[in-house]
Every structure is written in C-alpha cells, then in structure tokens.
UniProtKB/Swiss-Prot annotation:
EC number: 3.6.4.-
Protein name according to UniProt: Transcription-repair-coupling factor
Annotated signal peptide: none
Pfam families attached to this UniProt entry: CarD_TRCF_RID (PF02559), DEAD (PF00270), Helicase_C (PF00271), TRCF (PF03461), UvrB_inter (PF17757)
Cell location: Cytoplasm
Provenance organism: Borreliella burgdorferi (strain ATCC 35210 / DSM 4680 / CIP 102532 / B31)
SMART domains: CarD_TRCF, DEXDc, HELICc, TRCF
SUPFAM superfamilies for the chain: CarD-like, P-loop containing nucleoside triphosphate hydrolases, TRCF domain-like
Residue ranges of the motif DEEQ box: 711-714
Predominant location category: cytoplasm
PROSITE patterns noted in UniProt: HELICASE_ATP_BIND_1, HELICASE_CTER
MF annotations from Gene Ontology: ATP binding; damaged DNA binding; DNA helicase activity; hydrolase activity
Amino acid sequence: MNIDEELTTILKNNSNLKKMKEFLEQNIFFSLTGYEGFFKAFLIKKIKEYSKTGKIILIVKDEHTLDKIKNDLQVITNQIFELNYFSPLVYKGIGSKSTIFNERIKFLFNFYKKNPGIYITVLKSLLSKIPDKNTLLKNIYKIEKNTNINTADIEKTLITLGYEKTLRVTIPGEFTVKGEIIDIYPFGEQNPIRIALNFDKIEEIKKFNPLTQLKHDNEILEFQILPKKEIIWDDKTINTLKTKIKSVEYKKILEELDFKKETKTEEMFYPLVANTYLGDEIEKHTPIVNFEINNFEKEIEKIHQEYEKLYKEAEEAGKNIIDPKRILLNYKTFNLKSDVLFSKIKSLKSKETIEFKIESERNFFSNIALTKEEFENWLKNGFKIIIAAESESQKEKLKYIFKELPKVSIEVLKISSSLIIEKEKIAIILESNIFNTGQKINKAFESSKTKAIDSFVEIEKNSHVVHINHGIGIFRQIKRIKTSSLEKDYIEIEYAEGEKLFIPIEQTNLIQKYIGSDPKNIKLDKISSKTWIKNKANAKKRIEEIADKLIELYSKRESIKGIKYPEDNELQLLFESEFPYDETPDQIRAIKEIKEDMMSFKVMDRLLCGDVGFGKTEVAMRAAFKAVMGNKQVIVLSPTTILAEQHFNTFKKRFKNFPIKIEVLSRFIKNNAESRILKELKSGKIDIIIGTHKILSKKFTCKNLGLIIIDEEQRFGVKEKEKLKEIRISVDCLALSATPIPRSLHMSLIKLRDISVLKIPPQNRVKIEAYLESFSELLIKHAIESELSRDGQVFLVNHNIEELYYLKTLIERLTPYARIAIIHGKLTGEEIENIMHNFIKKAYQILLATTIIENGIDIPNANTIIINNANKFGLAQLYQLKGRVGRGSQKAYAYFLYQDSEKLNERSIERLRAITEFSELGAGFKIAMKDMEIRGVGNLLGREQHGEIESIGLDYYLTMLNKAIEKKMGKISSDEEEVDIKINYSGFIPENYAKNEQDKILIYKKIFKIQTEEESKKIRSELHNDFGPIPEEINSLLMLAELKILAKDLNITKLKEKNRALEIEYKNIESIPMEKIIEILQKHPNLLILNPSYQKSIFLSFKNIEKSEKINYIYKNINLLKTST
C-alpha cells in the first residue's frame, strides 16, 4: 500500500489542504498546528508538491529532530536531502563522521542542480558559509557511455576527489581498477558502479551489489561522481586559508593539507574559504519551512553559547582552534524569513493559522477483546480501518487474530505513529499500539550479508598457509616461470630454515590459510621432515574418534520418543507480536526450526549459535512460551548469578502481559524465598525457573519439566555437564552459545546435531557513534561528562591491569564527583559478581575493566565505552567491546584511543578505522573473527581439540572432520582421490587482468575448487562480471578444471603427457569403456593407442596440435569416451 496516495485520496476534499495550497500560491505566510505523529511528514510532502519550484527548505532545530522527520518522510518519498552541521567535537580535536560529509555534498549538489526534493537543514548550517555553485559543481566528475577515458587519468581524478584505491570496493569512497573493469563506490550512493571498457572506450555502466558483486540489470548512460567533501584543498584554496589564519599557529595543519590534501578537523576551516550562505542561494518561490523553532534569536544565541564554551575549554587545553565568531552568523546578521511555520501551539507570528485535528496515539494494551470491540464501533460508523503491520510475518499473525473482522485492512506500513482523523473517518493503527510494545525498529536485511567467506579471501603475501602435503609455511609470492615455450604461475611457499617450494597453480586447492596459534608462536614445517605426516596422522585419529562419538550420539537421540507440542495458539501469536523489533531472517529461520522440533516426537537437542546481541534470548523465550502453552515447565540455566539475574529481568519484562509465573534462584535470593520456590516448583505453580547450576541439585524437582534452556554450556563444570547429559535423554534441550562457529563445521555437523545459526546482526538497533582518536584527557573528560549528564554509565577498558589503577587516579582528578569501580580477572568470582551487581544497580557510574566485560551481560544504561590502547586489542575483541553499549534506547558512543607516542603505521590505523567507521563489516572483520571460531570449535567438540587445530590449522582440521563424517555416514567412498594431471600447457592470469596477488589467488582458488559443470559456468560468469572478458590464458585454466571433472566422472585417475601423446589411466580395468573405444577407432583409427604394457591405460594421440589448442583438444576427445554411441 502507498500510504501517501491513500491519504491523498481520502483527504482530496479537505479544506485545510486547499487553504495551504492557496496560501503558498499567493505567498502568504501561515502557520500549521494540530498535526501529530506521521501526519507531519505527510504535510511536509504536500508543501513540496504545492511548491512552484518542486522543492522546499525545511529548517529544524537539531540533528535529533532531523532524524525523526527524515525517518517518517522516507516512507513516502526518496527525494530527501539533509544538511547537518559538523560535529562540535572538532573543537576537541575530533573530526566529524564521514556520513555527515557524504550527506552534505549530496545536499549541495542536488540543491545547486535545482533538483526537486525536500531539503532539510539544521539551523547551525544556515549560520555557516558553504561553497558557491561554481566552486562545488566544478568538482563533480561526469562519466558517459561511449566516451573515451584514460585509466591513469581517472585514478588521479578520483584520488583528488578523496577516493581511495583498494583491492575490492565495499564502502563509499573506494575504487579499484581490474583490467578493463573499473569499480567505483561513489559518495552518497547506496550501491557502487561498474564501468566496463573496451580499450579506452566506456562500453557499459551499471550499478552492482558490493557483497555479491553481481551487476544490476538497468544500464546507466551517464553518471556524476561526487567528491568526498565540499571543499577540495587545491593550491588556490590552501593559499586562501593561509591569508585568513596565522600560519605559525596552524603550521602542522597547513603542512598536512599541503601534503595529503586533507586533515582531521579540517571542516573547522571550511567557512574561512567558502564564499556564500545557503540562505542567499535559495531559489525564488521555494517555500522556507520553519519546523517548530519558535524563537530564532534564542536558538541562535544557544548555538553561540555552546561553541563559545567549547572554544574556551579548547583554549585552556592549549589547542589552536578558530573563534566561533569568525565562522557563525549571529542573529543580527541572520535575515532568513519563513513562509510556513509548524507550531505545536497556535502562533501569534502569523495572521493565518491552519489547524488540523489529528490523533496519533490510541493504545489498546494488548487487550484484543477491547480492540475488536472498538474496531466494530468504528466500522458501524463508516470508518476505514488499516492496521499498520511491521513486517510480512506480523501481517500474517494479525490476519489470524482479526479474522472475524474482514473489513479491517492489514498492510505492512513503516510509519512512526497511528493516525485517526474523525472528520474523514480514517483510522490507521500501529500494531505496537495494539500490543503496547512501543514503536518497532525496522531495518532491511540482506541474507547475502552472511555469505560465507572462504579461506582464499584471507591469503595475503607473507601470511601463514597450510599445504595439505607439505605442512605449514609462509606464502611469499606468485612467481611466473617460463620454460621453453611454456609459461605458468607458481605459488612460492617458504618453509623452515628458508627452504622454498614452488607449487603449481593446479594445486591451489591444496593450500589453505593457516588459522590456529598466535602468529608469533607458529612453527614452520621442514620439507624433508616427517613432523607434518605425524601431525596429520594424530589429528586424523582424534578426528575419527570425534566423528564416532557424534554419530553415536545422533543414533541414540533418534531412537528416543519425546514430547510433541501442539500448533501455535492465539496466545503464542500475541506473545510473538509484542517483540519490539523486527526479527532478522536468521531469527525467523531458527524459531521455525525449533518449533518443528518441538511439534515432532523427537527429543530436541538443538544448539543456537550467535554473537552477543544477535537475538538468541528472544528465540529462547518463544520456545519457553511454547513449552508453557503445552503445560510443561521450563528451566533456564545460566553460568553465573549475574547472568541468571539478567535473564530473570528480561523474561519478566517480556512475559508481563501473560499469566506465566517466572522465578529466579541465585545467591541473592534469601532462604525463606528459596524454600517457597522449591515447593512451588514441585507443585507446578512455577512455569519458568531461572538460575545457576544450583537448580541441577537433587532437592530441586519439577512437576512436569518439558524444556531446558542452557546459556553458554561450555562455561559449566564437568559435574554439571554430566547431569545435563542425563536430563537431555528425555527432555527437550536448547543450548545457547555466543561464540560463532565456522560455516564448514556447521555443514559437517548439520546432519548429526541440530544447529541454528544467527549470523545476521540486528541492524544497529541503536546507532553507535564511534571515534578513533589519540589519547586525550580533554576527550575522556568530555565523554564521561556527556554520559553522566544524561544519567548514564561508562565503561573504560584497558588491556593491562596495572594501568587500570593509574586510569582510576586520572578519572578521579577529571571527574571527582563520579563513583568508580574496577573489575579484572585477578578478582575472585564472588568479587566480580558483587561489583557487576552493584554496577547494574547504578551504585557505580564508571566501570574500569579489562576485556572481562567483552562477553555476557547487557547493561542498557551504559552507553559510552572508552577503549584505551585500542591498537593492543584484536579486531574481534574490539567489535565485541563495542557491542557492550547501544543495548538500550539511548544513542551510544565508543571511543577507541591510542597513544600518540606509538606512531601507528597506516595499516594499523586503517584496521582500527574499520571498526569505527562502518557498521557493515566486511571480509577483514570476518577474518578477525576466526579466533572466535576456534573457540567455537572447542566449545562444540571439546577443548582438547585445540592441540590438533594448532598443529594442522583450523581449515584443514574441519576439512578432515567433514570427510570423516561423510565417510562414516556412507556419503562418500573411503578414499576419494584427486585426478593427477601432468600436461604441458601455458596458463596464468595476465597482469592487465588482475594486478594484485590477492585477486590472483582468489581466481586460482575458485578455478581449481570447481567440482561440477554448473560451478564452472558460474565462475566463468563471475570472472566476466568482476574482471571483464576472459583471456585465452585463463580459459586454459578453466578448461583444465573442467577436464578434471570429466576425468573424475569417467573413473580416470591420471592424465599424463608423454611424447606427443596423452596417457589416460583408469582406476581399474573394469572402468575402461572398451565398446566405446572400438567405436572411436572405427571412425578415427589413429586417435587412440592401446598398449598391452599399460593394462589400465589408453593413449590419446595429439600430433600436430597447437599448444594453445591442446587442452581443448584433449577435453573434446575424452568427452567422446563418455558420449559416443
């Protein structure tokens, strides 16, 4: 449903809308009042439609207001542009976020191009200068189909515009050149573009998906590429700046601008080199709309006071910054007049006021009977009723609940409020008003974002690798070797004592990234040593044992009959509808899998894997609710008292509208309460009991236990695990783990153990604003004071325990009034629990900690985290720590600090920036998560596996495990051998096709992992899509891979070139197709040769065959053995 069109039709005769149009046509200043909720956005869009220029300027007070209005407007239009102001933190040495630069340049470009739209600006942006039209538009780079470009020139231009050359484009501001393909991810765009060249001519321009790398269908004839920032620091601009500031005072900044053409906090200087104001550039007859700013003078004064305070603090800290009086207009010089005023109350400033009567809130508090009664009354009175569902799955649930009211429309609508207009008899009711959940947070999910990253993505120059036959070495380079008339690439791997092997590219599939030990502790294998063979044999033995155990467990579980629960009832649907977020696709899948288990006779023993915050608890609560609806009791088992308390609070809040009794057992519960709980558990009065391993003791018995939910099972002791094994035999079990597991292990175990994996994170339920900065007392003081001023709490994390106490002294000096606690691994378990308990209860405002907080509890009130010496942590750790905040409804902040004295290299800075800049994390992050996957393997298969993983590497370990399970389950034959191909050919990746070695390894790995003809077709398509037309040299490699598939199908084990003939060796004599050979010889007498000395072989003659045609010739003729009749 198009809500904008729907409302426009319903309100087509509305007198207020007619008045609005008249006033705008006659240039009469008027105010609007009585509007509510989403209706504000509808009115703003109407003003834009009535505008003579097709655009409006909407002035809002601040960023918060801008975000709220934008969210509603996005439902009904995509013509929205925003001009936010730069962060005031520039006065503390912190640059603005890249998104602000992107949105500003998009706003200014469209504004100067006179494109229709709603142009939203915060008041601050009107007080500061912007570049004029000519200055801005001259920096736009235009590309057109069928025009000629020079790749060297385009690279130079893009770098000038602020773009960065990378191996693969994944985020705005990156570009790459791959042969005749140029990928650019323009600033301000949702998707990158791919330019296909034919020599220097642009043959095609298309957008593509940065995750799948697949092109969109629609072709683009021309495209305009925006610069990163509105100011380009060319020589002229830098010289202008030098005349405006004391060059001695700002020497360092000026040097950076001269050298790098950009610098942190450079936006502070923009108004000094810009030359106009937005207010002076607004086109005539464009309505200027004031959104709820009742007193411009007062608001402008507040802005000046804010900046004056920051300026004074920075001066006291010895920082050189620009006086705000030089860059901000004051009220006297601000002369912009509004045409329309949105006002919550009737304004005296306008003679004309249009008053609407809109209701945006009507809560039904999950009382479905009351809701139905109200709806029936509305329908009798001729109302049109629309329920705004949050998602398709919610729509289906609502259809079921309101099935007796067929006249009630149920549509998926992403609006922020209900809308009731009595006069026009329309009621649009949010599902959150029916279920009293508050507005759901909606984000779009792409399943492709969870696409598995194969190990080949990670193999980089000088990284550790495993060759299946030779062991652990270091990948040095891809080396081109010419011998007589042949030319091939080889992979150079260095082993212990500097020994080197040159591996033919056909063996790329035998090379994997080594993941196991810390790089400092990795021991390289010796080529001639038997250590690798021994390590492989030991690992194989242990893997066989693990596979046997898993298969035995699987068989035992399959033979037991369990509880069969009924289908979902109305209460279950109501419970699920009250979830205050949209489910991720993975959550929906996991819930479906769990319910299918519960509604069958098999005993459920399912593992639910997913990172902290990925939604495991919600999935578990739905399973618990289903068990209670089936008249069964539920145990929720937690490894610590604090986690048990947290689960109790979460369950109580989530189940509050339902008649389900929940209790918690922990050491914080008094003895008399414990004995009451014990009795009620035994009598069946308690539906859900939450607690630590104490619940497993004999004195606690349930009347009718149906489900046990285990949180972080690996953290329990041996005794508890043994007890759980007993319970699992007859009771459904759902185990939760926050440690991710590798996809390959998941695929291995999927047949033996029921596993649901949550790999898609909820898309930024609350935005975390992250900063990467050098250590600064001023910054730490600001971060803490800002959080405490909104009654929040702060984490300050450091890798070193001793330094925590130094930091405590520093914080006490900076914020003497703050209540501070310290927590680290040297404290006892009880001490840690007490401190955390008190922090949750807000007895402390600041918690100084090591990475002990990286996993576990949610503290919604703690929304600022400062990580000192961030460069000392792994990327995975930083990601986990960042996830400690943003768990509630407040905006969250993460500060990643490093010491200036450390002189971090560019790679280290980029590595850290990946965490701070982008919520969408790519391959680099997934690679960093591998250390967590090792923990995941240990958790699933036993910690004792760690030694084997270290000795042969994680990827090879999992390959062996997968084969062992497949073999024992009869899925593959005992020893499947690779086809041994020894053919003289020329095959490599030309330099102009893929220049960097990472891309080359990726291509080689893909080619030599091909197992089917379909895979070959897919890879041919991918290569053409990513790099351009496939050259002859790569085609030879693909033909070689396809030849291997064909040989395998025909039971051929070896293809070996000998004296202008090819030996074709079969697995056994029985495999030789003698009838087909005779048929071929009758037609082509000299094509095949039989030699009695080679009983399992035949020979293919290829005299007078060109080298370039050789593999094609071999493929075609071996194919005759399969297809001749």
